């Protein structure tokens, strides 16, 4: 395919020795959102031909693993796996390379084979990025980060909501290196949530103590939950989770069992 002479990133990639113009997208994403740091362990899903692997290695200098159904031409200092990211066998191989502690960052610039039918291509993109998200959740360490390319469309909001459920910080970002006519956008998720709960979950708890700011405190599987409503120590309540942070959550009270018990006793 003939290249537009105005495609400066294509020619820049050739001049600077990168395998694809996509390299500059990752540079720009990282400059804006500071996802990759020095010595990070990084896994690139759908990594062929390897443009993002080269950038990840340059920024991090740490352990870099590329995964793709196709063979990835060797890159110095980068390990590769030929496999399907939805396969348990591939997940096992990734964990063997990055260690049980998990990866610091998972990146994915993969795109589905395009048919020319936009609705079909968008659906395929969402399916692929959902697989990437599920894989990332299995191989990231707690508070790890995620970058993935998504095609915009009517299912994009639903996908963003899925990412929000799993990460403390989420943003959608379009780097300058993306072509103006492209519908691609990059979703960034920072600080993987490893809490035993999520927004809208409901629990029956006992208020164990009152914090310094007057917040009632309860625990769900040893995870701290702060009440946003007035409660008393020892009170039994039903709560609904309204916000989740890496190390604690906030909840509102939706039922007070002690009050119900008192009402029954009065009857």
UniProtKB/Swiss-Prot annotation:
Kindly list the positions annotated as binding S-adenosyl-L-methionine. Answer: 50, 52, 68, 84, 109
- InterPro entries, A to Z: NA-bd_OB-fold (IPR012340), RNA_methyltr_RlmE (IPR050082), RNA_MeTrfase_FtsJ_dom (IPR002877), rRNA-MeTfrase_E (IPR015507), SAM-dependent_MTases_sf (IPR029063), TRAM_dom (IPR002792)
Question: Where does the record say this protein resides?
Answer: Cytoplasm
Under the heading Pfam families, the entry gives:
FtsJ, TRAM
Annotated TRAM domain residues: 196-255
- Magnesium as a keyword of this entry, yes or no, is no
Keyword annotations: Cytoplasm, Methyltransferase, rRNA processing, S-adenosyl-L-methionine, Transferase
Superkingdom of this entry's organism? Answer: Archaea
GO CC, alphabetical: cytoplasm
Keyword check for Transferase, yes or no: yes
GO terms of molecular function: rRNA (uridine-2'-O-)-methyltransferase activity
UniProt catalytic activity: uridine(2552) in 23S rRNA + S-adenosyl-L-methionine = 2'-O-methyluridine(2552) in 23S rRNA + S-adenosyl-L-homocysteine + H(+)
Q: Where in the sequence is the active site? A: 149 (proton acceptor)
According to its UniProt record, the EC number is 2.1.1.166
EC class (word): transferase
Any coiled-coil ranges, and where? none
Family the UniProt entry places it in: Belongs to the class I-like SAM-binding methyltransferase superfamily. RNA methyltransferase RlmE family.
Role: Specifically methylates the uridine in position 2552 of 23S rRNA at the 2'-O position of the ribose in the fully assembled 50S ribosomal subunit.
In its UniProt entry, what is this protein called?
Ribosomal RNA large subunit methyltransferase E
Organism annotation: Methanococcoides burtonii (strain DSM 6242 / NBRC 107633 / OCM 468 / ACE-M)
Q: Taxonomy-wise, where does this protein's organism fall, top ranks first?
A: Archaea, Methanobacteriati, Methanobacteriota, Stenosarchaea group, Methanomicrobia
